[in-house]
A protein has these predicted regions:
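N-terminal small/polar loop signature for handling phosphorylated ligands or for N-terminal nucleophile
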Residues: 94-157, 256-312
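An N-terminal, well-structured beta->alpha segment
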Residues: 3-110, 201-230, 241
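Glycine-rich phosphate-binding loop
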Residues: 143-151, 155-157, 162, 288-319, ...
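Short acidic, glycine/serine/threonine-rich loops at helix termini
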Residues: 104-109, 134-138, 156-162, 183, ...
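Proline/glycine-rich low-complexity loops and linkers
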Residues: 125, 185-207, 316-399, 407-408
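Gly/Ser/Thr-enriched, mixed-charge loops and adjacent short helices
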Residues: 15, 19, 39-43, 47-48, ...
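Conserved phosphate/anionic-ligand binding catalytic regions in large, soluble enzymes, centered on
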Residues: 44-64, 150-153, 233, 237-249, ...
Length: 424
């Protein structure tokens, strides 16, 4: 029998005595009664850390798990910080989620806690990709936003990403300040649960068209697309939230011959057809590549579950598909964008791009050859968004990205956008 730190027993017992549901109490009691204490220890040896990117962890009962209570406690901390930052303003936040197990429950919990604190919620009626949350924050003038997702992690995981009013993930000083507020919430009983449904306003499907109209403005080659509109393109959302929006974006660009992998088209948080829902891994693209060969596709695309990253595969001279790595894709996008901007007389010497320090230096060299500034930032797309915000009114942002398949073209979104990147 494993010896258990008394502090772990005390924490589990305090959860038992708190205002949680009976099912969770029964699960905790079962952990306490079990002769194998490993699950008890892992569930309660610490609090699930709210880091600079929010929460991420395995779902289950306990302080070190993603559940309605850890989500609620994080939301209470974020709500407290928003109320401190904007004491005399009507605060609103945007919320959505991807396909993962419990995502509707966690998103509902987030919305309820915000409204219980007098904060208005703009709530997507259906799951939508991460970039649409970022766009919604900016479009509706929200002060913050929450995306419930664990990106490409295994099915056992879930997460909670916090955004600020510019549409980017929170950065200094807000990230550290939010963490401080969340750490003050030490019990489920510290959460205000008295929800106010009148403060929830649903974002309807017509918002999709507003977003797609912005995506359409990114098109730089309408004539070329018209001439090749029947080019076969295969797309897989890998059971995620981009299954509707990527085909729609490709269509507004002018592409008509789009084949979606049927077995991976429906949202499913168990990701039954892949080991990991990560487009960086060739295994996750097996079905998409098979369909690509079947329809003689010129391009095979796939997004991760929350639709912020994408992968591209192209056929070689033998008809076999090659998965481009993030540096290759980023370099191609950079050269294409700058070539078209120069061709259309849009380069004035005040344009810039941004990439991360681990991304290929080839992108910087391409930018230099076009006379375009290329800023290099620390890893994390929030740092790219921070530069875009800092340069507003001074320079014009064209695009940027990181080698882990994250790209952003245009500045109407302030996080990785796999939907618009697929179109480009």
């Amino acid at each position: 029998m494993t010896n258990v730190n008394p502090m772990i027993i005390a924490k589990a017992t305090s959860w038992l005595k708190s205002n949680i549901d009976e099912k969770s109490k029964a699960e905790i009691q079962s952990l306490l009664d079990s002769t194998d204490k490993s699950e008890l220890i892992d569930s309660f040896y610490r609090d699930l850390e709210f880091g600079t990117g929010g929460l991420r962890g395995i779902m289950g009962v306990g302080s070190n798990r993603m559940n309605v209570y850890t989500v609620a406690m994080a939301t209470q901390g974020l709500a407290n910080y928003l109320l401190k930052c904007f004491p005399n303003e009507r605060i609103s936040v945007a919320i959505t989620h991807d396909c993962r197990i419990n995502n509707t429950l966690f998103a509902d919990t987030t919305a309820n806690v915000f409204t219980a604190n007098g904060i208005k919620v703009k709530y997507f009626k259906e799951m939508r990709p991460t970039p649409m949350l970022s766009f919604a924050i900016r479009h509706f003038g929200c002060k913050s936003g929450v995306m419930v997702t664990a990106s490409h992690n295994p099915k056992e995981y879930n997460g909670y990403k916090a955004y600020w009013e510019d549409g980017g993930q929170v950065v200094a000083p807000h990230d550290i300040n939010i963490i401080t507020e969340v750490q003050k919430i030490t019990s489920v009983d510290d959460v205000n649960w008295d929800k106010n449904d009148s403060l929830i306003e649903y974002i309807e499907e017509d918002f999709d068209l507003i977003y797609l109209n912005e995506v359409k403005k990114l098109s730089l080659s309408p004539i070329a697309i018209m001439l090749q509109r029947n080019m076969p393109i295969v797309f897989s959302p890998i059971h995620g939230a981009s299954g509707k929006m990527v085909p729609a974006a490709l269509k507004v660009f002018g592409f008509e011959n789009i084949h979606v992998v049927k077995e991976q088209a429906e949202p499913d948080g168990t990701f039954p057809t892949v080991i990991y829902p990560n487009p960086e891994e060739a295994e996750a693209l097996t079905m998409a590549l098979a369909l690509g060969k079947e329809v003689n596709a010129e391009l095979v695309l796939a997004c991760d579950p929350d639709g912020d990253r994408y992968a591209a595969c192209v056929p070689d001279e033998n008809g076999n598909f090659e998965l481009l790595n993030g540096n290759q894709t980023g370099s191609l996008i950079t050269y294409y964008l700058l070539s078209k901007w120069r061709e259309q007389g849009k380069l004035t010497g005040k344009e810039f791009m941004v990439n991360t320090i681990v991304t290929t230096e080839l992108i910087d060299e391409i930018c230099k050859s076009f006379g375009v500034t290329c800023y290099s930032v620390l890893t994390g797309f929030k740092n790219i968004a921070e530069v875009i915000l800092a340069q507003e009114g001074k320079q014009t942002y064209i695009g940027g990205g990181e080698e882990s398949y994250g790209y952003l073209v245009g500045d109407f979104v302030r996080d990785k956008d796999g939907v618009s990147a697929c179109s480009i």
